[in-house]
Swiss-Prot record:
This is Putative pre-16S rRNA nuclease. Its EC number is 3.1.-.-. Coiled coil: none annotated. It is found in: Cytoplasm. InterPro entries: RNaseH-like_sf, YqgF, YqgF/RNaseH-like_dom, YqgF/RNaseH-like_dom_sf. Belongs to the YqgF nuclease family. One of its GO terms (biological process) is rRNA 5'-end processing. Keywords: Cytoplasm, Hydrolase, Nuclease, Ribosome biogenesis. CDD domains: YqgF. The lineage of its organism: Bacteria, Pseudomonadati, Pseudomonadota, Gammaproteobacteria, Pasteurellales. GO terms for cellular component: cytosol. One of its GO terms (molecular function) is nuclease activity. Could be a nuclease involved in processing of the 5'-end of pre-16S rRNA. It comes from Haemophilus ducreyi (strain 35000HP / ATCC 700724). Its main location: cytoplasm.
Length: 138
């Protein structure tokens, strides 16, 4: 049975979003939500959840390279808990180390320096988080 999954790249100013299917194990970038100090416009997130009707939400967990937590880690956990509480959907956390670096590299290779826009980086990062989740959950 196909499962639709939405992934989020949490940030204090922008939250990238991507969608994917368990059958194809591919992700497609959707949008980046503006946030103020990590607080998103919940109505925008609700709209995308209603549109895609996901079975699962995945939130990228920012960790240091050695696997230890950083200040943003707890904020991402809080965001994940709020998603679960508001929308009553299961939420999984996925290690997101190096996704922003990989996203920048991918965007730069396609369009050079001028293509490196923050919202594009965040949505590609959300895709990479979801693809990583697929790789770890066959």
């Amino acid at each position: 049975m196909a499962t639709t999954i939405l992934a989020f790249d949490f940030g204090t100013y922008s939250i990238g979003c991507a969608v994917g299917q368990s059958i194809t194990k591919t992700a497609q970038s959707l949008t980046a939500f503006k946030s103020q100090d990590g607080i998103p416009n919940w109505q925008h997130i609700e709209k995308i959840i209603k549109e895609w009707q996901p079975d699962l939400l995945v939130v990228g967990l920012p960790l240091n390279m050695d696997g230890s937590e950083q200040p943003l880690t707890q904020r991402a956990r809080k965001f994940a808990n709020r998603l679960n509480g508001r929308f009553n959907l299961p939420v999984a956390l996925q290690d997101e180390r190096l996704t922003t670096t990989e996203a920048k590299s991918e965007i730069f290779s396609r369009g050079g320096y001028k293509a490196l826009k923050k919202d594009k980086i965040d949505t590609i990062s959300a895709c990479l988080i979801l693809e990583s989740w697929f790789d770890n959950n066959p």
